[in-house]
């Protein structure tokens, strides 16, 4: 299968797209010919998560042999990496609502779903391309990607990873997970700025030919573990396909019966994966984009204008504190009718004016698949309390945002209540002890761990082993730099491992 840029027409093979992440013109790689309606229920029924993954990913990466793909998948989705054999279990919350739990991996966040597999895909792509340079993975994180990428690439031969996170833009537990990261090939740096600052810099760096030449002379090339890389996005499609099979198996829906999906998202990758699943044949009806107070996506789905000229808010759902959603470019490409010139112009508009607008016909295509709602911090806490008190189920703030968006959508469109809905749960609640304590009126401890002990005592929810073990580990990475110094931080890291 060939992949092409959202902004151009040059085609590359799958392994080139996996290895390089971002196209040379700054666009994102997408299948040149998307495998539309290629999945049927019979293809995925009565299969394990790993078997479903093999079916789905063979459609997107046919370059890998069946045996090689299964080997990578089985290594990634193993008992050592996930605390449940189901990998992404569905929890029945209400008769018509199921929670898709995506937090049972090594770092207790949905990013594990892709980043457990992505290192295998990247190493395989490197071998297929005959690339001998060391690969430096550059990653910006709003909380969860960083730790999951670090854990995925820890001590993987031929790779190194540099993660940047905003000093005040992640939860204390998320920061501690990264600051205590193990591995000889990792570096973690905080920046004085927000996630958008870090992500925008890295996207510029990926198309900086001079810097690429400078590090190439030292035997190094750049790649990305953010969802701008198709190798990060593709594995996320799997859990929506698997969820469909599970809903049918549980008797929640019939074969080919439509269901809705609510996704809390900031960078648009997670909900785009659900859109890909729909394009591939999964009977997803409405995709509901759930946002926090950084509601640029909500406004787009209501107006057809994406406008970043607005205040940036630091919220209790920090992984969604994003105004420039990178994967939104892939979505624009599809609603333009796969028009790369139109997409490139939109991205120029966004860069020069901070906003873009779609026309009436394009907006109809948007509304045929998507809607959006946002939930502020006070509402998020109220939902955490309501869901726990009513159903005994503890949600993290991001999942609560999704639940709140579902409630608002149901209020606006009561007919949606007749259709089964999946709520994507993106993180374990213990990664966010302070807002959980505030929501449930539990005493906040002197440390995050004391708060978690208090939450556990009240709710009966046990500590994930990885978080329990984290307390005793030493801090390794405590540096914070100005965002203008990110390039030098990268070059200094290159100098360390390329000697």
Q: Language-model features: where?
A:
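PLP-dependent amino-acid enzyme catalytic core
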Residues: 1-499
């Amino acid at each position: 299968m060939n992949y092409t840029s959202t902004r151009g027409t040059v085609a590359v093979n799958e392994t080139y797209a996996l290895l390089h992440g971002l196209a040379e013109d700054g666009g994102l790689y997408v299948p040149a010919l998307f495998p539309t309606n290629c999945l049927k229920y019979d293809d995925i029924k009565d299969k394990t998560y790993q078997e479903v993954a093999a079916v789905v990913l063979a459609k997107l990466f046919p370059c890998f042999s069946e045996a090689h793909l299964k080997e990578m998948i089985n290594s990634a989705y193993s008992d050592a990496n996930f605390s449940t054999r189901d990998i992404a279990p569905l929890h029945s919350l209400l008769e018509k609502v199921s929670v898709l739990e995506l937090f049972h991996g090594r770092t207790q966040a949905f990013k594990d779903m892709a980043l457990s597999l992505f290192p295998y895909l990247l190493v395989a792509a490197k071998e297929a391309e005959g690339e001998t340079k060391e690969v430096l993975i550059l990653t910006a994180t709003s909380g969860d990607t960083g730790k999951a990428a670090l854990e995925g690439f820890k001590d993987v031969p031929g790779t190194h990873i540099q993660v940047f996170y905003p000093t005040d833009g992640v939860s204390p537990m998320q920061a501690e997970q990264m600051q205590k990261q193990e591995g000889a090939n990792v570096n973690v740096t905080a920046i004085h700025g927000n996630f958008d600052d870090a992500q925008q810099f890295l996207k510029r760096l990926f198309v900086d030919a001079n810097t690429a030449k400078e590090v190439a002379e030292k035997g190094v090339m750049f790649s990305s573990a953010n969802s701008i890389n198709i190798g990060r996005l593709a594995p996320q499609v799997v859990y929506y396909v698997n969820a469909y099979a599970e809903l049918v198996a549980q008797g929640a829906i019939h074969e080919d019966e439509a269901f809705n999906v609510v996704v809390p998202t900031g960078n648009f990758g997670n909900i785009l994966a659900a859109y890909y699943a729909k394009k591939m044949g999964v009977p997803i009806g409405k995709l509901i984009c759930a946002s926090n107070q950084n509601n640029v996506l909500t406004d787009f789905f209501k107006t057809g204008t994406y406008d970043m000229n607005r205040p940036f808010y630091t919220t209790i759902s920090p992984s969604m504190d994003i105004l420039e959603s990178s994967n939104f470019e892939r979505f624009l490409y599809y609603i333009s009718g796969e028009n790369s010139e139109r997409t490139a112009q939109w991205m120029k508009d966004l860069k020069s004016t901070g906003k873009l607008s779609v026309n009436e016909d394009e907006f109809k295509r948007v509304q045929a698949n998507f809607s959006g709602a946002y939930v502020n911090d006070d509402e998020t806490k109220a939902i955490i309390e309501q869901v726990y008190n009513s159903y005994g189920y503890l949600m993290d703030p991001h999942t609560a945002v999704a639940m709140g968006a579902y409630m608002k959508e149901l209020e606006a469109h009561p007919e949606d209540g007749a259709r089964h809905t999946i709520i994507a749960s993106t993180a374990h609640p213990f990664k966010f002890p302070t807002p959980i304590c505030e929501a449930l009126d539990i005493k906040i401890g002197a440390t995050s761990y004391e708060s978690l002990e208090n939450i556990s005592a009240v709710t009966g929810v046990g500590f994930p082993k990885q978080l329990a073990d984290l307390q005793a580990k030493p801090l390794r990475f405590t540096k914070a730099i100005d965002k203008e110094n990110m390039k030098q931080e990268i070059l200094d890291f290159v100098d360390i491992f390329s000697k």
